[in-house]
Amino acid sequence: MESYKKEFIEFMVDSNVLKFGEFTLKSGRKSPFFMNAGAYVTGAQLRQLGQYYAKAIYEHYGDDFDVLFGPAYKGIPLSVATTIAFSELYGKEIRYCSNRKEVKDHGDTGILLGSKINDGDKVVIIEDVTTSGKSIEETFPIIKAQADVEIVGLMVSLNRMERGLSSNASALDEIQEKYGFPANAIVTMEDVVECLYQKEYKGQILIDDERKKAIDAYYAEYGVK
């Protein structure tokens, strides 16, 4: 495993973002693990997170894009932190944009926060995690309703490696098939298991045999065939 992947997995654990237990996801699935980007709360955490995302986006999509779109609510700090990191690491000024859950009718009106989206813009979407592709069903129409844009791709931090909403393909593969743009992640759940299974980290084993059995059972039901 590449060293940066191991570092990022440990960063998620240290930030209390990656947890193990029993969780009900937005998709309705019961999962033995959960990733919550809302737990990144300090300046140091957000700075480091933005750098991980910026490096992954640069690796997969380069810097030929104009806007980084982070869907409300968790995508808002992700887009801000990553545009800052992009400027620091690569000297490229990317605009951030997010949506509001409710349209604002006074002052800075409309559905968007940050930059407006203009005809001809190239957009990268940034999210914490995509389980079933449901979130993109909500985000894609919002972006396309703003202007005639090209969506370059989607970047998430964790690929959960499970089926999407309507096929046996992974959620990320299903997004690419349905919407026509690539979807990538900093790390996969397979990377997480490889990194943590039966390996002590800071005095504890986060994935022991029992937890590995629960993860395997989850993928037997929801994993990519």
Where are these regions (language model features)?
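Short glycine-rich phosphate-binding loop at a beta-alpha junction
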Residues: 63-74
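Active-site-facing substrate-recognition patch
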Residues: 1-61
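Short, glycine/charge-rich flexible loops or terminal/linker lids adjacent to PRPP-binding catalytic cores
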Residues: 80-123, 137
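PRPP-dependent phosphoribosyltransferase catalytic core
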Residues: 2-10, 141, 145-225
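Phosphate/pyrophosphate-binding loops at sites that engage ATP/ADP/AMP, CoA/4′-phosphopantetheine
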Residues: 54-65, 140, 144-148
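Structural detector of well-ordered beta-strand residues that form the stable sheet scaffold
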Residues: 68-69, 97, 152, 184
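Gly/Ser/Thr-rich loops at beta-strand to alpha-helix junctions
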Residues: 72-78, 132
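A contiguous pocket-lining binding segment that forms or flanks enzyme active sites
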Residues: 112-161
